[in-house]
């Protein structure tokens, strides 16, 4: 009985040892038996330990300085990747940019030897203190850019390259549209920290355009940055202002807006080359006037509604519309002159006959009406002379009867021909007058643009090419 009892105690003891051995089996062996998951590498353990040590007691709402009076210096730079759009109507400039910021965070320093030689870590920007630098002249309410990771070095240097899409306000000067040159600015600064707490240092005066994607309508002539200060009643705030000088590429508007307008302007002159008895003269002038109105509406949709400046092309269109309106009035007057006769109007004044039948035709290189009538009459007498003499000899009594009627008909025909010739003289006179006015008006309006391009845009473009 004693032997049997000792055997039972030995079995219980062996069973207890096996149970204890199974309960205290290593966790890694248990996981390996269940799923075969590997252990963390040494580098991952070091980085995990580094993050725990750095951010265990880190407060991202507090400025990372050793003393309260210390100033954080922010190195600030700007890189532009795309000039998306320039909205002249709403006076907005849309850009895709990268904000480059660098500062020292004294709370994020470590010894690389204590963490497996780790010198750089990537930290989300919403996990540490970042400067609240925003675009002041923002137009859509989005003052900040995207939230991305920062690069933190062992000495506490934090580098943050932040992509952003901005719509900034830009005062558009459309005086020389579409040959205009605009100067748009972007002003950055801290929203809450004054200059005694955060100082902004301009890293590079030139905007980085290494990854710039060209715009089909605008070309950046220059993009420069400058540092300034804005003050209020108690404090001063440092700010960085970038000025973008952009030039419009005018080829599209030249081909589809300016050239058609100039063509319509000179088409008005052609109206006076049509015969005065053609009713299509009024129709042509009216069609030109309607076309110019359509072009004016197109320009009104593009440019801002401002009374400070009037675009050059708008002035030219208004000038041409006045030009066409006057041509319609003159054409109506010429047609009225053409259809005059002795039965509808009084006799022609002597000064009208002298000026329009003798002097003006010579000045306009036209054949004189008196010369043409004399030649036609002379030829008629030569052709019908013998027959007329034979008729007079044979029917002298009949000639006396009809002479009064023939003379009257000749007088009526001469008056009608005189008025028609005056209408031709008026058409020729207005043809040269309107052609001269059209040329002078076109040159007078577009010469300032040519002068501006020759003295401003071309030298800047040559300077950029040499660089």
Curated annotation (Swiss-Prot):
Keywords carried by this UniProt record: Cell membrane, Disulfide bond, Glycoprotein, Ion channel, Ion transport, Ligand-gated ion channel, Membrane, Receptor, Signal, Synapse, Transmembrane, Transmembrane helix, Transport
Q: Where in the cell is it found?
A: Synaptic cell membrane; Cell membrane
CDD domains to which the protein is assigned, alphabetical: LGIC_TM_nAChR
Q: Which reaction does it catalyse?
A: K(+)(in) = K(+)(out); Na(+)(in) = Na(+)(out); Ca(2+)(in) = Ca(2+)(out)
Q: Which GO terms are recorded in the biological process aspect for this UniProt protein?
A: behavioral response to nicotine; presynaptic modulation of chemical synaptic transmission; response to nicotine
In the UniProt record, which is one GO cellular component term?
cation channel complex
- Cite the Pfam families for this sequence: Neur_chan_LBD, Neur_chan_memb
* Known regulation of activity: Activated by a myriad of ligands such as acetylcholine, cytisine, nicotine, choline and epibatidine.
Q: Can the keyword Glycosyltransferase be found in this entry's annotation? A: no
A single MF term (Gene Ontology): acetylcholine receptor activity
**Cleaved signal peptide residues:** 1-29
Sugar-modified residues: 155, 183, 229
TM stretches of this protein: 255-275, 284-304, 317-337, 430-450
Q: Which cysteines form disulfides?
A: 170-184, 234-235
Q: Which residues lie on this side of the membrane: Extracellular?
A: 451-467
Q: How is this protein situated with respect to the membrane?
A: Multi-pass membrane protein
What is the protein's known function? Answer: After binding acetylcholine, the AChR responds by an extensive change in conformation that affects all subunits and leads to opening of an ion-conducting channel across the plasma membrane. Component of neuronal acetylcholine receptors (nAChRs) that function as pentameric, ligand-gated cation channels with high calcium permeability among other activities. nAChRs are excitatory neurotrasnmitter receptors formed by a collection of nAChR subunits known to mediate synaptic transmission in the nervous system and the neuromuscular junction. Each nAchR subunit confers differential attributes to channel properties, including activation, deactivation and desensitization kinetics, pH sensitivity, cation permeability, and binding to allosteric modulators.
Spell out the NCBIfam families in the cross-references: LIC (TIGR00860)
Assembly with partners or alone: Neuronal AChR that forms heteropentamers composed of two different type of subunits: alpha and non-alpha (beta). CHRNA5/alpha-5 subunit is only able to form functional nAChRs when co-assembled with another alpha subunit, can be combined to CHRNA4/alpha-4 or CHRNA3/alpha-3 and CHRNB4/beta-4 or CHRNB2/beta-2 to give rise to functional receptors. Interacts with LYPD6.
Name of this chain's protein: Neuronal acetylcholine receptor subunit alpha-5
Native organism is Mus musculus (Mouse)
């Amino acid at each position: 009985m004693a032997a049997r009892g000792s055997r039972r105690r030995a079995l219980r003891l062996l069973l207890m040892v096996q149970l204890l051995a199974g309960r205290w089996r290593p966790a890694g062996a248990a996981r390996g038996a269940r799923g075969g998951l590997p252990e963390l590498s040494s580098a991952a353990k070091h980085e995990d330990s580094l993050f725990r040590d750095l951010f265990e007691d880190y407060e991202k709402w507090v400025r990372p300085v050793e003393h309260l009076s210390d100033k954080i210096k922010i190195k600030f730079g700007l890189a532009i990747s795309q000039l998306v759009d320039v909205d002249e109507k709403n006076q907005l400039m849309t850009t895709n940019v990268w904000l480059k910021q660098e500062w020292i965070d004294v709370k994020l320093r470590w010894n690389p030897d204590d963490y497996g030689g780790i010198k750089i870590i990537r930290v989300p920007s919403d996990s540490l203190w970042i400067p609240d630098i925003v675009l002041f002249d923002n137009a859509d309410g989005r003052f900040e850019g995207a939230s991305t990771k920062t690069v933190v070095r062992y000495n506490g240097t934090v580098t943050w390259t932040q992509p952003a899409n901005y719509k900034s306000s830009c005062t558009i000067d459309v005086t020389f549209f579409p040959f205009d040159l605009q100067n748009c600015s972007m002003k950055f600064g801290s929203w809450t920290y004054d200059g005694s707490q955060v100082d902004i240092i301009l890293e590079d005066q030139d905007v980085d355009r290494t990854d710039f994607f060209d715009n089909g309508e605008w070309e950046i002539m220059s993009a420069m940055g400058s540092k300034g200060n804005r003050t209020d009643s108690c404090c001063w705030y440092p700010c960085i202002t970038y000025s973008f000088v952009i030039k419009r590429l005018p080829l599209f508007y030249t081909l589809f807006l300016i050239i058609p307008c100039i063509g319509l302007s000179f088409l008005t002159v052609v109206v006076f080359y049509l015969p005065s008895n053609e009713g299509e003269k009024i129709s042509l002038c009216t069609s030109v006037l309607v076309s110019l109105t359509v072009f004016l509406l197109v320009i009104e949709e593009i440019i801002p509604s401002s009374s400070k400046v009037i675009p050059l092309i708008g002035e030219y269109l208004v000038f041409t519309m006045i030009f066409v309106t006057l041509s319609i009035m003159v054409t109506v007057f010429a047609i009225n002159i053409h259809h005059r006769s002795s039965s509808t109007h009084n006799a022609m004044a002597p000064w009208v006959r002298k000026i329009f039948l003798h002097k003006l035709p010579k000045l306009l290189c036209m054949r004189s009406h008196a010369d043409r009538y004399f030649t036609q009459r002379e030829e008629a007498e030569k052709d019908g002379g013998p027959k007329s003499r034979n008729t007079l000899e044979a029917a002298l009594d009949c000639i006396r009867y009809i002479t009064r009627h023939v003379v009257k008909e000749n007088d009526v025909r001469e008056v009608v021909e005189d008025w028609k010739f005056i209408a031709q003289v008026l058409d020729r006179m207005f043809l040269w007058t309107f052609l001269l006015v059209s040329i002078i008006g076109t040159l007078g309006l577009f010469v300032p643009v040519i002068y501006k391009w020759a003295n401003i845009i071309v030298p800047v473009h040559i300077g950029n090419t040499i660089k």
